[in-house]
Amino acid sequence: MRKLGLIAGGGALPVELASHCEAAGRAFAVMRLRSFADPSLDRYPGADVGIGEFGKIFKALRAEGCDVVCFAGNVSRPDFSALMPDARGLKVLPSLIVAARKGDDALLRRVLDEFEKEGFEIEGAHEVMGEMTLPRGRLGKVSPAPEHMADIDKALDVAREIGRLDIGQGAVVCEGLVLAVEAQEGTDAMLRRVADLPEAIRGRAERRLGVLAKAPKPIQETRVDLPTIGVATIHRAARAGLAGIVGEAGRLLVVDREAVIAAADDLGLFVLGVDPQERP
């Protein structure tokens, strides 16, 4: 198996991927993005790199013998005027700015194009860990009740529509009312906003109501930016009074699956995977 270069942003996903590769005996190195990557990744071979340091990243990947790369983790859209790119990054910067004006997906595709031009193959996180995506059906012991089905349906519709508009990947619906949609703030911040809403229009621990739906954008570069949930998502959804989470089977990453199942079961939330081509 070819050596993997993990381009690591923030969050738990890069940490789990590194642990998986280590346990599976797959050779890998980690390119740790400054200000984003988890400090626990420092123990692995690789390099600390900045977002605009394309030359340093390519040099480090080749020095480590990597010919396949996987992008994982959260990275905020940069302030291009404040970037400090290296010489290689300076050549790429104008095209990145143009792509960014077209949306996040166009920006990601432009970054991938640059890596592929350098001869690196792109491998998605779900390809590195095949068992990482949400399966079809219930994940854990809790099932949605009949009264949740309409919210599941509408939340998925809203999530898919904002994805079509390249706005975000998530939406929260409670008893037919759209409580929130995700944009640049991300899912965690969206759920915090829901938790701050009056209990009269959302659920609570004693009577859970409402659904978080996450869905990829129709034109999304799935090798890089599949929607993701983890243990923190479960806890924030619970604090917001939600009844559960729904996503498209095979198109939602579940980070630390066993811990997600345990947290959802303990808090009484359902996690449901639906066929991307069907309504639940």
From Swiss-Prot:
One of its GO terms (molecular function) is UDP-2,3-diacylglucosamine hydrolase activity. Its EC number is 3.6.1.54. It catalyses: UDP-2-N,3-O-bis[(3R)-3-hydroxytetradecanoyl]-alpha-D-glucosamine + H2O = 2-N,3-O-bis[(3R)-3-hydroxytetradecanoyl]-alpha-D-glucosaminyl 1-phosphate + UMP + 2 H(+). GO terms for biological process: lipid A biosynthetic process. Transmembrane segments: none annotated. Its cofactor is Mg(2+). Keywords: Cell inner membrane, Cell membrane, Hydrolase, Lipid A biosynthesis, Lipid biosynthesis, Lipid metabolism, Magnesium, Membrane. It is an enzyme of class 3 (hydrolase). It is a peripheral membrane protein. Consists of two domains: an N-terminal lipid X binding domain (LXD) attached by a flexible linker to a C-terminal catalytic domain (ICD). Binding of UDP-2,3-diacylglucosamine by LpxI induces a conformational switch that brings the catalytic domain close to the lipid-binding domain for specific recognition of the substrate and catalysis. PANTHER family: BLL4848 PROTEIN, LPXI FAMILY PROTEIN. Hydrolyzes the pyrophosphate bond of UDP-2,3-diacylglucosamine to form 2,3-diacylglucosamine 1-phosphate (lipid X) and UMP by catalyzing the attack of water at the beta-P atom. Involved in the biosynthesis of lipid A, a phosphorylated glycolipid that anchors the lipopolysaccharide to the outer membrane of the cell. Can functionally complement lpxH deficiency in E.coli. Cannot use CDP-diacylglycerol as substrate. This is UDP-2,3-diacylglucosamine pyrophosphatase LpxI. It comes from Caulobacter vibrioides (strain ATCC 19089 / CIP 103742 / CB 15).
